Amino acid sequence: MIQVLLVTICLAVFPYQGSSIILESGNVNDYEVVYPRKITPLPKGAVQPKNPCCDAATCKLTPGSQCAEGLCCDQCKFIKAGKICRRARGDNPDYRCTGQSGDCPRKHFYA
C-alpha cells in the first residue's frame, strides 16, 4: 500500500523525466508510461519540480525521509501527534496528526 502511495506521489510530483517516454498502452513500467504502438519522447525542458523528500529516479523516499507531502508532513518528517491539521467545521471535531503518517486523518461523518 505504501509503495503504491509513493509511486502515486512521485508520479504526481515528478510528471516528466528526461529519460521517460510515452508509449501507447497506458501501463506504468519503470520510469515510463507504456503505449505499445507509438513512442513519443517527452518534451525537452519539461518542468521537473524538486522535492527533497522523494527521489525522482527511484520514486522512493530519500534516505531519512518519512513522508514526501501531506498536512502532517514537514521537511520530510511526520509532524508530532496531536497537532491540528484541519480545524473543526460544523459538528465535526478538529482533526489532529497521528505522528505516524504525513496525511491528516480523513473526515468522519456522523449520522
Curated annotation (Swiss-Prot):
Domain Disintegrin: 45-111
Keyword terms, alphabetized: Cell adhesion impairing toxin, Disulfide bond, Hemostasis impairing toxin, Platelet aggregation inhibiting toxin, Secreted, Signal, Toxin
SMART domains given in the database record: DISIN
Propeptide regions on this chain: 21-44, 110-111
Disulphides: 53-76, 67-73, 72-97, 85-104
Record motif Cell attachment site, residues: 89-91
Broad class of where this protein is predominantly found: secreted
Compartments where located: Secreted
GO molecular function, one term: toxin activity
GO CC annotations, alphabetized: extracellular region; plasma membrane
Position of the signal peptide: 1-20
Pfam family, one: Disintegrin
Expressing tissues: Expressed by the venom gland.
Assembly behavior: Heterodimer with piscivostatin-beta; disulfide-linked.
Family of the protein in this entry: Belongs to the disintegrin family. Dimeric disintegrin subfamily.
Annotated function: Inhibits fibrinogen interaction with platelets. Acts by binding to alpha-IIb/beta-3 (ITGA2B/ITGB3) on the platelet surface and inhibits both ADP-induced platelet aggregation and platelet aggregate dissociation in human platelet-rich plasma.
Protein name, UniProt field: Disintegrin piscivostatin-alpha
Organism of derivation: Agkistrodon piscivorus piscivorus (Eastern cottonmouth)
Lineage: Eukaryota, Metazoa, Chordata, Craniata, Vertebrata
